[in-house]
């Protein structure tokens, strides 16, 4: 690769709010989105909440000349809602479904039925290997009483691990999506500290868009004040994150958001605002010690995030075990009731009552058993994430105590990882 190598990458990201039968003005919004993407001709368009495969096929056909490669990530019952459109050939595609996706009995929230996931596409651009990830994490339905907090932390860790272990051959890593987390939330900090990804909004040289980069704003006609909760001026939960390995330099030249309306038509594309980033990748000769200046501070931030995540996952484990125990007792009670009904049915006096109560009792046992098994699985999944975090925390703390150099967010570690692959 030439030393004067330079690559400009234009990226588009949007949570499309494309829910069949529920989302307003779907057909019109999809048509205008397709027109806009054709007009702008981005290198990559990464979309979330496209829960109608028919709408994906419509966009794929409409964008086929501008974006010849496209992929729809299928998972769960409803689907992940993730899809990508690329001007460049997609070399590889991988999908990973998160282990924890909410609760099946919270059917009115729907996250469990979607099978929230992360999609990876590998592109080769002028000799450079780009790993682009698109994801959508579990929604936050209540800031004050967030029953899914542990699930979202576990998803953030799973996402960070997936990126860490699949990006070792990549020169540039790009993550776009709706993380459903504010910039300073634990999951967001954990993700950025472990992967070394940088926030385009923080790093950009030129920003134009909604105040504070918010991606849900009150002036959007599809957003209600209830959606914003205690943040009346808007929230920033959609992101463009990126990094480059040693030997390359990446920066965000411009970042734009829509501001509650379509730039050309006036009405919004979605209840979320779109993100449009222009990234510049250049060849950069490796420095002698590119990370030593900030290594200690970054390790301290990582250790802090890992400790907090371990604590929150511990709370989630305790809660899951409590629910499993409760429904285990209910299941035992139901089985005891069935035994009693069998005894009563053997006699003449209470046979009709026993027969009448038999079906509800069987339903109680089956329902309680299903919920018991789900929470047992939830507890084990949270324990697995906590054990992984504890292992990384132990290793990182030992490294800090020995005064050794960087954790995986630093470039020298990534060089070592890449060397091992060769």
From Swiss-Prot:
Designated name of the protein: Sphingomyelin phosphodiesterase 2
Region spans: Disordered: 397-422
Cofactors (names): Mg(2+)
Cystine connections: none
Organism taxonomic ancestry: Eukaryota, Metazoa, Chordata, Craniata, Vertebrata
Catalytic activity as recorded in UniProt: a sphingomyelin + H2O = phosphocholine + an N-acylsphing-4-enine + H(+); 1-O-octadecyl-sn-glycero-3-phosphocholine + H2O = 1-O-octadecyl-sn-glycerol + phosphocholine + H(+); an N-(acyl)-sphingosylphosphocholine + H2O = an N-acyl-sphingoid base + phosphocholine + H(+); 1-hexadecanoyl-sn-glycero-3-phosphocholine + H2O = 1-hexadecanoyl-sn-glycerol + phosphocholine + H(+)
TM region(s), chain numbering: 325-345, 354-374
Species for this entry: Rattus norvegicus (Rat)
Record site: Important for substrate recognition: 180
MF GO annotations: metal ion binding; phosphoric diester hydrolase activity; sphingomyelin phosphodiesterase activity
Subcellular location: Membrane
Residues where Mg(2+) binds: 49
